[in-house]
Amino acid sequence: MTASSLNSREKRAAVSLASVFAFRMLGLFMLMPVLAIYGQSLEGFSPIWIGFAIGAYGLTQAVLQIPMGRLSDKIGRKKVIVGGLIVFAIGSVVAALADSIQMVTVGRALQGMGAIASALLAFASDLSRDEQRPKVMAVIGMSIGMSFAFAMLLGPIVAASWGIAGVFWLTAILAVFGIFIVTMLVPNAVNKAPKGDTLASFSDIKKLIKHPQLARLNAGVLLLHLTLTTIFVVLPSQLIKDGLVADHHWYLYIPVLFLAFLLMVPIMIVAIKKEKEKQAFIGSVALLTISMLAMSAWVNSVVGIAVCMLLYFVAFNFLEATMPALVSRIAPASQKGSAMGGYSSSQFLGAFLGGMLGGYVAQTTTTQAVFAAAALVGLIWLIIAWKMQVPPKSKVISLMTKLDSEEHAQTLASQLVALPGVIEATVVRDENRSYLKINDKEFDLDQARKVAGLI
């Protein structure tokens, strides 16, 4: 076992926590391609209620995920995660037993109240060493992407056989599996990761809201997920109108998602190697906008929809993969957790607002107008992102620090920031820890440890 590889405990943590994440997100995503079709038998069905039901989890999750993360720091990660999964399972059962779209919406809101994302990520950080933490997070990130693709396959198949109720019952079962994994398979944490790396602080978030570059990214992820839920309010029904039966929708979704991933990877590699990240970012927002505009024109053609969705998901995948890394690079060294907390809340809020927008436009106008509205959202994002600044590549590390006084903390911060490769240094006396944003090519860890009095 080398220092550059995951140890057995980290591998176990990565796989088990990624599984919990995937089970939960699979349950949330499975509804997107089927509710607009199979929800028509529910009492009170209307496009605006479909949009509300699809996005309701986003509102409650946006509100509760940061408090749940803070609570996990006080009473323990496993308790909060298991409690959240129980609430998620209860919400799934409420929705499964519902005979009206309003009660389905209540169930979806309850699902979102099981807001365990922050606690899960903090737990993953607790169970991994500083230098291995990005790998563990990457495994979790991949599991979320895979769960979306699998949901596009599984949702239509399950709903075709057992209806909307079947989707929610399966979601409840997955939540129970998640509880088993957390209680039986996830290792117990011996240490806690630095708070600045993992947990959001409301006071820090208030300060970061004013940061122009972070504000652009928060607005961006909100608008990105707004477009996603907007189009899925009407897309499944439109595919049926165009002649693609409901249980065959995955014939379109899976090839599109697979090809979109294959096309996105070289774009990302070239953008990073050639240092053209901003150009690729702006280009992806433009591609997303154009794809939705084209969709509004080709809405009566399955082939046209497939081509537009391919372009949309190439852009979506690139932006979804790029923005968290940009947030980490831009965020102040000791406030990464708060920056990511604000970013995640914006993402969930976007899912809610997208459902509302898609439902309202579908109910008051036409399907074409829904896609045109999504294109307008993309245009607004393009304007917001135009002056975005991409910072130099960096990463954040933290060091335990022995501090005698506030003056000592300020002196140490000045000494650390003067070291080669240190872009920013923040010393937090309350935590006895120093957070460094560094250029890995120039930074000498032993030199920093020596200045901090660790060797």
Give the location of each predicted region.
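Conserved MFS/SLC helix-loop-helix module at the cytosolic interface between two early adjacent transmembrane helices
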Residues: 63-99
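Helix-loop-helix hairpin linking two adjacent transmembrane segments in secondary transporters
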Residues: 140-183
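Juxtamembrane intracellular "pre-TM" segments in multi-pass secondary transporters
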Residues: 2-10, 187-218
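Helix-to-loop junctions at the C-terminal end of transmembrane segments
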Residues: 65-76, 263-277
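C-terminal membrane-cytosol helix-exit motif in multi-pass small-molecule transporters
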Residues: 173-192, 381-389
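Residue-level signature of mid-helix packing/kink "hotspots" within the transmembrane helices
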Residues: 58-66, 148-149, 257-265, 351-352
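Cytoplasmic helix-loop-helix junction between adjacent transmembrane helices
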Residues: 107-144
